[in-house]
Amino acid sequence: MSQEKQVFSIDLAGRQLTVETGQLAKQANGAVLVRYGDTAVLSTATASKEAKNVDFFPLTVNYEERLYAVGKIPGGFIKREGRPSEKAILASRLIDRPIRPLFADGFRNEVQVVNIVMSVDQDCSSEMAAMLGSSLALSISDIPFEGPIAGATVGRINGEFVINPTVEQQEQSDIHLVVAGTKDAINMVEAGADQVPEETMLEAIMFGHDEIKRLIAFQEEIVQAVGKEKSEVKLYEVDADLNQAVREMAEKDMHSAIQVHEKHAREDAINEVKKRVIEHYEAQEADADTLGQVNEILYKIVKEEVRRLITVEKIRPDGRKGDEIRPLASEVGILSRTHGSGLFTRGQTQALSICTLGALGDVQILDGLGVEESKRFMHHYNFPSFSVGETRPMRGPGRREIGHGALGERALEPVIPSEKDFPYTVRLVSEVLESNGSTSQASICGSTLAMMDAGVPLKAPVAGIAMGLVKTGEHYTILSDIQGMEDHLGDMDFKVAGTAHGVTALQMDIKIDGLSREILEEALQQAKVGRVHILNHMLSVIAEPRTELSAYAPKIITMTINPDKIRDVIGPSGKQINKIIEETGVKIDIEQDGTVFISSINQEMNDKAKKIIEDIVREVQVGEIYEGKVKRVEKFGAFVELFSGKDGLVHISELALERVGKVEDVVKIGDVITVKVIEIDKQGRVNLSRKVLLKEEQEKEAAKEENKQEQQ
């Protein structure tokens, strides 16, 4: 590859995309700087010179956010970037998934792809720039990568598809799709949608693929110009004689073990065969490398037989038909003190989801590279080791947990009521209690049940299903509701979530080069049938959201005040609002438009806080009559509190009908008197009169007496 700087450009969605090579990070195997609008991402690819002694391909993809990219300095004491944000982790996964299938089987050299986001233009996706940069860095390097790949985001506005929509266009779009693939086929899909029909989602995917083909042609030109010759790498292979010997010893028993229907019994049967074979070679004092190869051969025997049974004999490991869903069981309201809970079980996969409602002040604050500053709906996914009968240290969420949580969030967000209709922050936590495949989709079903149990007025209930594929040559079988073994040994994990009306989320990962339109279409239609079946089951448990919230959920009052009065409610240094909170124990959130949200478990305290705020923002009008308490006495008159935060002066001359020599002769501090507003001066000071009311009362009494005498 030439070490001179070279620049290549293409138009992408009306904005220029530029690739620079030969100037930066020249010690990496491959490096490019991708500029898309004002977005800039440095993508590098590096590989170890020797293969690693592992039984998998050690690929790592990093998407590194730098806050300088948006002109921010990190918060806190350290003032530097810490652990990756959730968005960065999701972007890393997004790039990893279409790249991983395009390395040869048996390639064991460690590969690291690093994307550093250096400048961000919000209308030009840094994730898409990083995906193209990752593919290109690998393609121009000497690493044996069988790409290139490319990705595109697709939106739909007023029925028209849009490539790489701007921030403004994304707000109007009912589809948020990321699609990636080679020039021949799609190999990754990630989407959120507002209950969009399957046919429309398929059209959006194919629309994105047309743009992908153009970007791949652009990359091929660059590879032709500056690409290095691919290095010769020895792929991991098992010894042919050992392969034959192990197969003769284990194949027959392994085939029988695979057809045991129950998961744990099947695993025990397979492990028994493995144990017998391993012990045989240990008795012959085989070295670690030989034992590693034996394990590899045994794994291949299982994989080949499972795939043969599914594609040729149409038999699944647990005996189900291709489109058959495992037995379903659901329950709601199983945790008394939570705001809502839902238990969803599908075969040996089980998720318990809990819904917690909070005030709008409980929103998650986001401090990243995006324009979004907060979110009021969250879904978190936990996968403890006991769910698969294993032991391992309990640590924080990993990439997988964050990815599954985000998928559930994307699937459910389109049906969450607006802030205006339901002024709550909603947090869902899904605890996976048992796992045998499709746990992310079980968490979506459990979360729907939990929100309905909590009384969240969902626009429609959502269910999810994971589809699988086993493809050998031109023959393939699509599987509904895949279990763990089918996911692990199959070619596709295609998760589809949605309502009865349409799709709300898609996620597709594949282990082969790509999928045709026909397979995608068939998988989507088969998923729809399964999803509706699951929805009908869920609705048989709870038909609609509860009409009342849990007694332990916060009650929220919404009121509107004049925006000019917000400062009065808050007070100097927050003194006034803190006083209300201290007095009532409520949470108060005030929007810039004057909308006020008051929340607490105690409705009585909510009402009290509302009354205090109403008094603070209340406008005094001339002619109004108040019953107020005397707060202060001066020589010239008495100050009377009309309502919280508002006083007025009754001048000594307005205290009584007769002349008053001393204020204390008429009123004392703490007395409650009735007064009338007679004037509000230019400085906003309120002048009151007791005398006017006394005179009016005197006149009424005189009129009554006169009428009485006339009647006599």
UniProtKB/Swiss-Prot annotation:
EC number: 2.7.7.8
Molecular function terms from GO: 3'-5'-RNA exonuclease activity; magnesium ion binding; polyribonucleotide nucleotidyltransferase activity; RNA binding
Organism: Bacillus anthracis
Residue stretches making up the S1 motif domain: 623-691
Protein name: Polyribonucleotide nucleotidyltransferase
Keywords: Cytoplasm, Magnesium, Metal-binding, Nucleotidyltransferase, RNA-binding, Transferase
InterPro entries, sorted: ExoRNase_PH_dom1, ExoRNase_PH_dom2, ExoRNase_PH_dom2_sf, KH_dom, KH_dom_type_1, KH_dom_type_1_sf, NA-bd_OB-fold, PNPase
Domain KH: from-to ranges: 554-613
Function recorded in the entry: Involved in mRNA degradation. Catalyzes the phosphorolysis of single-stranded polyribonucleotides processively in the 3'- to 5'-direction.
Binding site for Mg(2+): D487, D493
Location in or out of the cell: Cytoplasm
SUPFAM superfamilies attached to this UniProt entry: Eukaryotic type KH-domain (KH-domain type I) (SSF54791), Nucleic acid-binding proteins (SSF50249), Ribonuclease PH domain 2-like (SSF55666), Ribosomal protein S5 domain 2-like (SSF54211)
A GO term from the CC aspect: cytosol
Entry's family note: Belongs to the polyribonucleotide nucleotidyltransferase family.
The UniProt record lists the keyword Transmembrane: no
A biological-process GO annotation: RNA processing
Gene3D superfamilies noted in UniProt: GHMP Kinase, N-terminal domain, K Homology domain, type 1, Nucleic acid-binding proteins
Co-factor requirement: Mg(2+)
Known catalytic reactions: RNA(n+1) + phosphate = RNA(n) + a ribonucleoside 5'-diphosphate
